[in-house]
A protein has these predicted regions:
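GST superfamily/GST-like fold recognition
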Residues: 142-146, 180
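Short glycine/proline- and acidic residue-enriched helix-loop micro-motifs
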Residues: 94-115, 205-215
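Amphipathic, non-transmembrane alpha-helical scaffold segments
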Residues: 24, 28, 113-121
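Generic beta-sheet signal
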Residues: 134-140
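Phosphate-coordination/substrate-recognition cap region in phosphate-metabolizing enzymes
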Residues: 32-98
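An N-terminal RHG(E/S)-centered segment typical of histidine phosphatases
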Residues: 1-43, 56-60, 84, 178-216
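Acidic, low-complexity terminal tails and accessory targeting/binding regions
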Residues: 76-88, 129-134, 150-216
Length: 216
């Protein structure tokens, strides 16, 4: 699943460090709804990236579980926004995940999609190779989830950006000799995704755009 909603704006209106943000009140409600969804599921393992927003989500969804931190599943790392030309900022946000995203594409001027695959696929292989578990909950990020879902569907290092991952959404996959993708993007608080027509990156840009003069 993806972590619950966060705000990437600090109290002063400047972009907050994406490595430090925690869940908003809405994000906590999304995590609580996911907890109810998983109430009847026996989870053998619960893992998250090492960032606060996934760890906080995991602790709400599975309060009795020991949370494993897997740094390889951290979110795509962008560059400093001040390093992106002002006339390219909007496009970098709203078109970050559009169509089949090339491996050489940089996320907000930082890490490439190929570099994302370089770290998440070995971690995935390590998880799958461990036969001691039957059901694992992985609380990750939108970029990770798109990469893993696309890999499960195609078996290739392909990144389908249009696999939207709303905050707090759940994906259901079976893995054995092959991958089976059973469900994608289940949002317990908004099953039909009627609360917004914006993608996650469009929503982030909408929040940041009024403060673009503070990004430099």
């Amino acid at each position: 699943m993806r972590h619950g909603a966060v705000s990437y704006l600090g109290p002063d209106g400047r972009p907050a460090s994406p490595d430090e943000v925690g869940l908003t009140e809405v994000g906590r409600r999304q995590a609580e709804a996911a907890r109810d969804l998983f109430a009847a599921v026996d989870l053998d393992r619960v893992l998250a990236s090492n960032l606060p927003r996934t760890l906080e989500t995991a602790r709400i969804v599975a309060p009795d579980a020991e949370i494993e931190e897997w740094p390889a599943f951290r979110e795509l790392r962008g560059d400093r926004l001040a390093g992106i030309p002002e006339d390219e900022l909007e496009d970098e946000f709203v078109h970050a995940f559009r169509g089949v995203v090339p491996n050489e594409k940089r996320f907000l001027g930082g890490e490439t999609i190929g570099e994302l695959f370089d770290r998440v696929l070995p971690a995935l292989d390590r998880l799958v190779a461990d036969r001691s578990w039957d059901t694992t909950l992985a609380v990750l990020h939108g970029g990770d989830n798109r990469a893993l879902l696309t890999y499960a569907l195609t078996g290739e290092r392909m990144f389908l950006g249009h696999l939207e991952q709303a905050p707090g959404c759940v994906n259901v996959l079976d893995v054995g000799d092959d991958w089976i993708v059973r469900a994608v993007g289940i949002a317990p608080l908004d099953l039909l995704h009627g609360s917004t027509r914006l993608t996650t990156m469009e929503a982030i840009w909408q929040d940041l755009e009024p403060y673009r003069d503070r990004m430099t």
